[in-house]
Amino acid sequence: MTRKQKRLAIIGGGVGFLTAAVLLVMFAFSQAVAYFYVPGDLAKADLAPGTRIRLGGLVEAGSVKRGDGKTVTFSVTDTLAVVPVTYTGILPDLFREGQGVVAEGAFVAGSSVFVADTVLAKHDETYMPKDVADRLKAQGVTLGGKENIQ
């Protein structure tokens, strides 16, 4: 092999290695990504049952029901739509009606109930998409816990 052929072989091997690494990273990210939706956007979204998503909004007033053991059912709303959620586990200390929440999980096939395996409670609109926070403020919902949904 000449020097030129060796150089081309090394460059070709490096490009092949980098291509394989990029493809593996892209595949891993596509499996781990959970897109964020608010209840009003779910009607437009074409989600297959079992697709993992993050559902964000406010815990609807009067919707929290404690079941057997650690099972809790509640509804998440963005004032346009309401989604029933079931969660089994210990809820965060900041979780309460009228407060912001992000639940990660999936819809069960043949059901409109969102089954969450992770629930994060928020105390204000800091991590809420701007359009959702603006819509809630326009409806008179204060996101610091001072006022609840009417």
From Swiss-Prot:
Cytoplasmic side: 1-7
This protein's encoding gene: ccmE
NCBIfam families named in the record: PRK13254.1-1, PRK13254.1-5
Segments passing through the bilayer: 8-28
Protein name listed in UniProt: Cytochrome c-type biogenesis protein CcmE
Parts of the chain on the Periplasmic side: 29-150
One term under GO cellular component: plasma membrane
A GO molecular-function descriptor: metal ion binding
UniProt KW keywords: Cell inner membrane, Cell membrane, Cytochrome c-type biogenesis, Heme, Iron, Membrane, Metal-binding, Signal-anchor, Transmembrane, Transmembrane helix
Subcellular location field: Cell inner membrane
Any one Pfam family match given in the protein's UniProt record, by short name: CcmE
Entry similarity comment: Belongs to the CcmE/CycJ family.
Bilayer topology annotation: Single-pass type II membrane protein
Top-level taxon in the UniProt lineage: Bacteria
Binding of heme, residues: H123, Y127
GO-annotated biological processes: cytochrome complex assembly
Coarse class of the protein's main subcellular location: membrane
InterPro entries hit by this protein: CcmE, CcmE-like_sf, NA-bd_OB-fold
Job of this protein: Heme chaperone required for the biogenesis of c-type cytochromes. Transiently binds heme delivered by CcmC and transfers the heme to apo-cytochromes in a process facilitated by CcmF and CcmH.
